[in-house]
């Protein structure tokens, strides 16, 4: 029982150290590159497709209405 408790405590501390190190690395990268550089700013580009007509939207709605 002592061995299990010691191993559990050791791995818990090891996990805490690993997560703190990961947070420090991310903070350092954010400081170096800036917060804007780490954001994906292209995710909205695919939200609107001007090539789709009203008929295309109606066809999509009928295809997806039972989904």
UniProtKB/Swiss-Prot annotation:
The keyword Secreted applies. Disulfide bonds: none annotated. Residues 1-23 form the signal peptide. The keyword Secreted applies. The modification Leucine amide is found at residue 33. One of its GO terms (biological process) is regulation of defense response to virus. It is found in: Secreted. Residues 37-67 form a propeptide. Expressed by the venom gland. Its main location: secreted. GO terms for cellular component: extracellular region. Keywords: Amidation, Antimicrobial, Antiviral protein, Secreted, Signal. Belongs to the non-disulfide-bridged peptide (NDBP) superfamily. Short antimicrobial peptide (group 4) family. Antimicrobial peptide. Shows a low ability to inhibit hepatitis C virus (HCV) infection in Huh7.5.1 cells. This is Peptide Ctri9293.
């Amino acid at each position: 029982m002592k061995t299990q408790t010691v191993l559990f405590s050791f791995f818990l501390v090891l996990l805490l150290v690993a997560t703190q190190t990961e947070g420090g690395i991310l903070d350092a990268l954010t400081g170096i590159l800036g917060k804007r550089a780490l954001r994906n700013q292209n995710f909205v580009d695919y939200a609107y497709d001007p090539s789709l007509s009203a008929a295309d939207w109606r066809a999509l709605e009928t295809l997806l209405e039972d989904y």
